[in-house]
Amino acid sequence: MKFGKEIAKKNQIIYRYIILKIQSFEWPANTRIFSERQLEIRFNSSRSQIRSVLATLLNKNIIRYTKNTPGYFVCKDVGFSFFHKTQDNLKVKYAKLSTLIKKLLSQDDASVFANIDSTVHLDKFKGIEAKFFDENKKHFLNVCFFAKDDILNILDENNLQQQFFREFAYNGIAIEKRHCVTSVDKESGCLVMYDMYYDDNDNFVVASKSNFLNPELKVINA
């Protein structure tokens, strides 16, 4: 039994190593990752153990295997993008992050998040707000993040316009799963998206509410 637990623990270490490499964009989409042999040497593991981990990643469509150019590659649509694909697909030029961590969660928002996952009580957490601007300096998106203070402190204004997952990867937090609900703001008619993110052990990490400021905007692939 102890031997089985040790194997499972080693598998998790190898799995997380690969996930964090991808999440931090050290291994971006279409990049060839380490070979079975390289991983075997790096982690002092058997070939069968390495293949077991790679099989899990293949089944989750995080990596792919090609025969023409033998090797494992990061999938093109691996799913670590911070932004949802929308009709206008605006590029973020810069972001402004609130310096204060405070209570931002409304009762209505709390109800939406509770419908996504009733086991996470976001009313216990504070929030921080980020404003996003396009290359023409037009303010087009507000995002509120809700989590424990130590998680919120990881967020970096200088990197928010790229991928906030990168900051979590640098801090050893592997984002594995996302649950999402979309709605429309009754007053503005604009798109609102509620997201909850979980690590590779299925533990809640952070939630976000994204308010898009263009009433014509629609999600085409979330």
Swiss-Prot record:
Sorted keywords for this record are: DNA-binding, Transcription, Transcription regulation
Supply the SUPFAM superfamilies for this chain. Answer: Winged helix' DNA-binding domain
* All copies of domain HTH gntR-type, residue ranges: 8-77
Per the UniProt entry, the disulfide pairs are: none
Q: What is this protein called?
A: Uncharacterized HTH-type transcriptional regulator MG101
GO MF terms here are: DNA binding; DNA-binding transcription factor activity
- Presence of keyword DNA-binding: yes
- What is the organism of origin for this protein? Mycoplasma genitalium (strain ATCC 33530 / DSM 19775 / NCTC 10195 / G37) (Mycoplasmoides genitalium)
| Database matches in InterPro entries | Tscrpt_reg_HTH_GntR, WH-like_DNA-bd_sf, WH_DNA-bd_sf
Coiled-coil boundaries: none
